[in-house]
Amino acid sequence: MKTIVEKITKEQLNTEEGKKIIGQAGDFLKEGGLVAFPTETVYGLGADALNKTASTKIYAAKGRPSDNPLIVHITNMGALDKIADIIPEVAYKVADAYWPGPLTMIFQKTEEVPYETTGGLDTVAVRMPSDEIARALIDAGGGYIAAPSANTSGRPSPTKAEHVEEDLSGKIEMILDGGAVDIGVESTILDMTVTPPMILHSPR
C-alpha cells in the first residue's frame, strides 16, 4: 500500500484545496481505511469507529493488543447519544467546561459501537478534540472516528507527521500533515460509569 501524505493548515480548511484534501481523507475513512491526523494532544490513527473491520485494522497497523480499547472522537454533544447508553447529568457539566479539549470520558456503550472498537468492553471512551483539522476530518469521515496515537505500540506518541510516516508508511491509506501538535501528551481519562466520576489517567 502506498501511503498518501498531504500537508494541510487550519487556514486551508475553508479553501477548495483544503476541502478536497479533507474530503479524500473522509472518503478513505468511510471506505474502512486508516488516516493519521493531528489533534491538540498527539497525532491520531483514525478509522470509522462504528465499522468493526476498520477498527480491527488499527490494531493490526499498530501491533496493538486487541483488548486495548480505542478512543472514539466526536465533534458535538448530539453525537454522544448514539454511542453512550447512559449519560449522567454531571457528564454534560464536565463537557461544557472541558470539551472540546484533551479530556476523555468513559460511558456504558450502545449496541452501535462494536466490541472491536472497545477492546471487548461494555464501555466506550469518548473525546471531543479542539483541533480544527481533526474536527473537519471527523465530520467528513462520518462523525465517529476511533483513534489511538498514530505509532507502533511501544514507540513514543507522535507529535509530527514525519514521526507517523517513519513508523506507519505503507500500512495506512493517508497522513494529514498539520505540522507539530500543541500539547504532545495524551488526554486525561474520566470514568463516568461510577459515582462520583473517577480519574483513570492524568498526564504527568
Predicted regions and their residues:
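Active-site-adjacent structural elements in enzyme catalytic cores
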Residues: 1-204
